[in-house]
From Swiss-Prot:
Belongs to the immunoglobulin superfamily. AMIGO family. This is Amphoterin-induced protein 3. Residues 405-508 are cytoplasmic. Gene3D superfamilies: Immunoglobulins, Ribonuclease Inhibitor. It comes from Rattus norvegicus (Rat).
Length: 508
């Protein structure tokens, strides 16, 4: 009996083991397996700085960001990104890639950021970047690029930032932009290259939003008058590329490296450059002024009819028919732009981008729209009411003047105040008499040595004055109070004292 139990247990164990092996054959491999020498964190796969000379054999399908920078990779295999359908960012900087090849990005249609900086790339061919329709940022700086195919960036319709600095490029087509479109591109970095010639008309034809971040500093540009006027105008307009790297914009005065001078600091080199040497380099932007709530329509007037017209709003939104996402801006069938009710958010630079087979190059037109708030209407001023009020006040004042008697108490107060004053009244007859009085004596002042008193001011009445006979003396005391004329004292001299009683004082 014990042997039977042991045999049953052995059979069960064998059955369980065979079932487990069958399940292992049916289940797919774990997609979260992390490659050797790499670090996996959620949707991030980092293999940076591991000394890899070849690509990892198995990559997890959940990776949205893959970092392979700071390794020793020399080649990328076609279709190596096929398992990574969610990939959005790929970093391949600081490797030893000298060529890309056909089909290396075929299965990376969702890629947004591609970093190929600090490698050994010498040439970019037309098919090297195929399959990157959604790419927005491409970093190619610090390579050895000497040549770009005419359509090297063909198909990158969503590219907005392109960095090509620190390479060996001696030319660049600003007319064609090597297959790039103007509708999305906002940053173009060509600094620190070997650009010895640039087409000034092609530069001038670029839209302002691209000029704002077009970096051309640290290039052996010639000290050309037309280029000088163009860059100086950009500098005066305050474009970021010129403002941020003002001192790095240099040119060669004598076509030798030792003759490098700064554009905006050595005016003597350009003293013979007149404005007439570069007429019409840029079409001035049209200034438009409108008010909130009004309607606005902008026309893309090109030299010849354009096959394709697009607009760029002040918020860098690409506007094609039917219009903006919020519906406030419409692009009509003729290519014009219409705004039904202007708001403050519509202020800024509108750029029209026109292209077509009949145009020699893509044309741009710019409208700088200023939106003003409507002035509040002043409150209505009721002139009739104010006129009536003024008439009533004037009538009351006239009636008071005509019929209101003066205040007697006020008169008494005025008289009392006048008595208390210490200066003479101008209309007093006694004061007039004192002013015309004279001092007479029996002894005439015939002696020349006789002097009048220095303490009294006297006046002699004319001899012909009637009624005085030259004998009446009016003497006023020095301490006489002019405010109290009743205290006047008449004093007779020693010789005329007896005659004053009989003859008396005669006043008229």
């Amino acid at each position: 009996m014990a042997w039977l139990v042991l045999l049953g247990l052995l059979l069960c164990m064998l059955g369980a083991g065979s079932g487990t092996s069958d399940l292992e054959g049916v289940l797919p491999p774990d997609p979260h397996n992390c490659p050797n020498k790499c670090v996996c964190a959620a949707d991030v796969l980092s293999c940076a700085g591991r000394g890899l000379q070849d690509l990892p054999a198995a990559l997890p399908a959940t990776a949205a960001e893959l970092d392979l920078s700071h390794n020793a990779l020399k080649r990328l295999h076609p279709g190596w990104l096929a398992p990574l359908s969610r990939l959005r960012a790929l970093y391949l900087g600081y490797n030893k890639l000298d060529v890309l090849g056909r089909g290396v990005f075929t299965n990376a249609s969702g890629l947004r950021i591609l970093d190929l900086s600090s490698n050994l790339l010498r040439r970019l061919r037309t098919y090297d970047l195929d399959g990157l329709e959604e790419l927005e940022k491409l970093l190619l700086f610090n390579n050895r690029l000497m040549h770009l195919d005419l359509d090297a960036f063909q198909g990158l319709s969503m590219l907005s930032h392109l960095y090509l600095s620190c390479n060996e490029l001696s030319s660049f087509s600003f007319n064609h932009l090597h297959g790039l479109g103007l509708t999305r591109l906002r940053t173009l970095d060509l600094s620190s290259n070997w650009l010895g010639h640039v087409s000034v008309p092609e530069l001038a034809a670029l839209p302002t939003f691209l000029k704002n971040r077009l970096y051309l500093h640290n290039n052996p540009l010639p000290c050309d008058c037309s280029l000088y006027h163009l860059l100086r105008r950009w500098h005066q307009r305050g474009l970021s590329a010129l403002h941020d790297f003002e001192r790095e914009y240099t040119c060669l005065a004598f076509k030798v490296a030792e003759s490098r001078v700064r554009f905006f600091e050595h005016s003597r080199v350009f003293k013979n450059c007149s404005v007439a040497a570069a007429p019409g380099l840029e079409l001035p932007e049209e200034e438009l002024h409108t008010h909130v709530g009004q309607s606005l329509r902008l026309f893309c007037n090109t030299t010849v009819p354009a096959a394709r017209v697009a607009w760029v709003s002040p918020k860098n939104e690409l506007l094609v028919a039917p219009g903006s996402q919020d519906g406030s801006i419409a692009v009509l069938a003729d290519g014009s732009l219409a705004i039904g009710r202007v708001q403050e958010q519509h202020a800024g630079l509108f750029v029209c981008l026109a292209s077509g087979p009949r145009l020699h190059h893509n044309q741009t037109l710019e409208y700088n729209v200023s939106v003003h708030k409507p002035r509040p209407e002043p409150e209505a001023f009721n002139t009739g009411f104010t006129t009536l009020l003024g008439c009533i006040v004037g009538l009351v004042l006239v009636l008071l003047y005509l019929f209101a008697p003066p205040c007697r108490g006020c008169c008494r107060c005025c008289r009392r105040a006048c008595r208390n004053r210490c200066w003479p009244r101008a209309s007093s007859p006694l004061q007039e008499l004192s002013a015309q009085s004279s001092v007479l004596s029996t002894t005439p002042p015939d002696a020349p040595s006789r002097k009048a008193s220095v303490h009294k001011h006297v006046a002699f009445l004319e001899p012909g004055k009637k009624g005085l006979n030259g004998r009446v003396q009016l003497a006023v005391a020095e301490d006489f109070d002019l405010c109290n004329p009743m205290g006047l004292q008449l004093k007779a001299g020693s010789e005329s004292a007896s005659s004053t009683g009989s003859e008396g004082l005669m006043m008229s």
